[in-house]
Regions:
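Short, basic/polar, glycine-containing "phosphate-handling" surface segments that engage DNA
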Residues: 1-61, 65-141
Length: 141
């Protein structure tokens, strides 16, 4: 997938009513994960998350959907998670469908925004799709 396709997929996801059960899988699909990968992650043996309602994709991201108002607490749990470290996750992400918080664990950069604004920040996660980004020192991008 290219950046335009990813932006479109993330925008479509954010426009739909929030589905806590399927959000992590649809988020990964938006960044180019194949149906077979999603199917494997839905299976309990592939998902090694140690956080409630979490989904861990090895070498990529640890995502958790949480109750409203708990995004910061859950992001901290993801950060402290042994599974996050063991799986060498590059990102952690917590959302309740209202708020959206993420951290790039390689740079320490943190993203906090309303869930509805998350498509504006799709570039934060482009490395999940194998797209490298070069940041401008002055603007941060």
């Amino acid at each position: 997938m290219n950046a335009v396709e990813i932006e479109e997929a993330i925008s479509n996801l954010a426009e739909q009513p929030f589905d806590a059960v399927n959000f992590p899988y649809e988020f990964l699909r938006a960044f180019g994960n194949k149906d077979t990968t999603i199917k494997r992650l839905r299976g309990s043996s592939e998902n090694k998350s140690d956080v409630e309602n979490g989904l861990l994709q090895r070498n990529n991201i640890h995502i958790a959907v949480c109750p409203i108002g708990e995004t910061n607490t859950v992001l901290n749990k993801l950060r402290a998670s042994f599974a996050t470290e063991k799986a060498k996750a590059k990102f952690i992400l917590a959302t309740d469908g209202v708020d959206f918080e993420a951290e790039d664990l390689t740079t320490g950069e943190i993203l906090v925004c309303p869930y509805s604004d998350s498509p504006k920040h799709f570039g934060f996660f482009l490395t999940l799709a194998g797209i490298s980004i070069v940041r401008n020192r002055e603007s941060g991008w």
